[in-house]
Regions:
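Low-complexity, Gly/Pro
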Residues: 1-32, 313-315
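Short hydrophobic/aromatic-rich beta-strand segments that constitute the beta-sheet cores
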Residues: 54, 141, 150, 163-165
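Extended, loop-rich substrate-binding clefts of extracytoplasmic carbohydrate-active enzymes
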Residues: 91-158, 172-178
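Extended amphipathic alpha-helical segments with heptad-repeat/coiled-coil character used for oligomerization
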Residues: 202-218
Length: 315
């Protein structure tokens, strides 16, 4: 298995020029390039205070998130969807598998469709590197991870980033685990809190040094992290998960690397043929002092909670 981190720097290092993009109107999304060979290798997206990047080498998934020009989630990690197949390994965004007997050849998530929208209009004129800005952004993509059909989207509007992963199993697949969505919070965050819709369940301080730790929160619905030095914090709220599948919060505290949050499902289970389920998160940010950060985080949680349709899990 190969992890493919920070590869956009290697591939795009020589591209120092920019080509203007165009936004279509009546033509519709069908005018966007069909072939991945014509898709952008890196897209920098700015909507209000939020900035993110869509990374081609990571199979057109997000790569880091900034808020008010401050790094909230690092680029040096995988986002999107990853599955761990029993006796095979990790496969998905930024996780590739070596093909047995074929040195140098890898198996990847097969992305078959990519559409970008700014201010609800399709973006045309794809170029290797693009800068997009507006009042709203949406990315829609379709892919296959072996027998799994995946439809995923990223939407930024009104100060909230919403990410969705819809999985459909065309055949049964034996899994160690699946991570439908994940976020690599900055290692600069020093404190955290987990909670449900009733309030905070757990709070703590991240490690400053030492070996990484990977706890699991099975009953929490959201995670908040905060960096007193910047006065900024991030929240991931689990809006939706299938009623017949778990939606746990697994997190890795890796000092100096990241504070990684993963939505975790199908742990040591077979995903049955015909499974059809949606996982969705809302990402929001806030400013606060060291004294009132939990209060500000809870207020932001309430705002993100309003995005939940339905309120608990997929019907």
């Amino acid at each position: 298995m190969r992890k493919f981190f920070n590869s956009s720097v290697l591939i795009l290092g020589a591209l120092t020029w920019q080509v203007p993009m165009s936004i279509g109107g009546a033509e519709g999304p069908s005018t966007q390039p069909v072939s991945p060979a014509n898709w952008p290798q890196k897209v920098i997206v700015t909507v209000g205070d939020i900035r993110t990047r869509i990374d081609g080498p990571k199979m057109w998934t997000m790569s880091g998130i900034d808020f008010q020009d401050t790094v909230m989630a690092t680029e040096d990690s995988a986002y999107g969807t990853v599955v761990t197949i029993r006796n095979v390994g990790h496969l998905g965004s930024a996780h590739f598998l070596d093909v047995p007997g074929k040195p140098g050849e890898v198996e990847k998530e097969n992305v078959t469709s990519l559409q970008l929208f700014m201010d609800d209009k399709p973006v045309m004129g794809f170029t290797p590197m693009m800068n997009l800005s507006g009042k709203s952004f949406r990315m829609e993509r379709k892919s296959k991870i072996r027998v799994l059909d995946l439809e995923s989207s990223v939407s930024i509007r009104d100060g909230v980033l919403i990410e969705t992963a819809h999985l459909h199993a065309t055949k049964a697949i034996d899994l160690r685990v699946t991570y439908p969505l994940m976020y690599a919070w900055t290692p600069e965050a020093t404190v955290y809190a987990f909670g449900n819709d009733q309030g905070i369940q757990k709070r703590g301080v991240f490690l400053k040094e030492g070996k990484l730790d990977t706890p699991l929160e099975k009953t929490s619905r959201w995670m908040a992290v905060f960096n007193p030095a910047s006065g900024k914090g991030s929240i991931c709220y689990l809006l939706k998960h299938p009623s017949d599948a778990d939606g746990w919060l697994q997190w890795t505290d890796a000092p100096g690397i990241y504070r990684k949050l993963r939505i975790m499902s199908f742990v040591e289970k077979v995903m049955p043929e015909g499974f059809d389920g949606t996982y969705q998160t809302a990402i929001g940010f806030f400013t606060a002092t060291e004294q009132d950060w939990e209060k500000q985080a809870l207020q932001r949680v309430d705002e993100l909670k309003a995005r939940a349709r339905p309120a608990t899990s997929e019907l």
